[in-house]
Amino acid sequence: MTEIDVVYIEDDDIEAELFSLGLSSRGVNVLHIPDAEPNSLHLLQIAPYATARAIFIDFWIGVVSGLDVAKWLRESGDTRPFFLLTAGENPDPNMLKQLNITYLQKPANYNKVASAISAL
């Protein structure tokens, strides 16, 4: 089975590792970016991050909103599918629609996440 690369922007290393472990057996390779700093987000322009099929973004990355990160990425021309992961926040549905973001609750259902990725 060919692995599908996705990016996960998440400041909690344990959450990122759990996400990676949950998807690895389902043919998904998670490329972790640990913060929303410009130097880190620059990785999205470099292989293998640049060719990843989708980007998963935590709702809060330190003090930065995942929606702000998504908005910046869209304004920078990134057209890949975005998924916003949150443990309880209720993101603005209009903002999700405007930025073309799929909203997912934590903890993630890895079977559903892998199916959504495979359908891309």
Which residue ranges define each predicted feature?
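Two-component/phosphorelay signaling modules centered on CheY-like receiver
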Residues: 13-35
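A short, hydrophobic beta-strand element within the central beta-sheet of small alpha/beta folds
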Residues: 79-90
